[in-house]
Amino acid sequence: GVPINVKCSGSRDCLEPCKKAGMRFGKCINRKCHCTPK
C-alpha cells in the first residue's frame, strides 16, 4: 500500500483518508494509514 501521513488506531480510521487521497482500501500499519491505489 501507499503510506499517507494519517495516524490511526484501526483500519476503519483509514477509509475516509484514503478516499480523500483518491485511493481505496485502508489498512492501519504501525499506527499510520496505508492505502491501495485504484
UniProtKB/Swiss-Prot annotation:
InterPro entries named among the record's database cross-references: Scorpion_toxin-like_sf (IPR036574), Scorpion_toxinS_K_inh (IPR001947)
Disulfide bonds: C8-C28, C14-C33, C18-C35
Keywords from the named record: Disulfide bond, Ion channel impairing toxin, Neurotoxin, Potassium channel impairing toxin, Secreted, Toxin, Voltage-gated potassium channel impairing toxin
GO molecular function: ion channel inhibitor activity; potassium channel regulator activity; toxin activity
Subcellular location: Secreted
Gene3D superfamilies noted in UniProt: Knottin, scorpion toxin-like (3.30.30.10)
Keyword Methyltransferase part of the UniProt annotation: no
Coiled-coil intervals, chain numbering: none
Chief location: secreted
Tissue specificity note: Expressed by the venom gland.
Gene Ontology cellular component terms for the protein in this record: extracellular region
Protein purpose: Completely inhibits the (125)I-kaliotoxin binding on rat brain synaptosomes with high-affinity (IC(50)=0.1 nM). Is a potent Kv1.3/KCNA3 ligand.
Family per similarity comment: Belongs to the short scorpion toxin superfamily. Potassium channel inhibitor family. Alpha-KTx 03 subfamily.
Domains as described in the record: Has the structural arrangement of an alpha-helix connected to a beta-sheet by disulfide bonds (CSalpha/beta).
Protein name, as recorded: Potassium channel toxin alpha-KTx 3.17
Organism name: Buthus paris (Scorpion)
Lineage of the organism: Eukaryota, Metazoa, Ecdysozoa, Arthropoda, Chelicerata
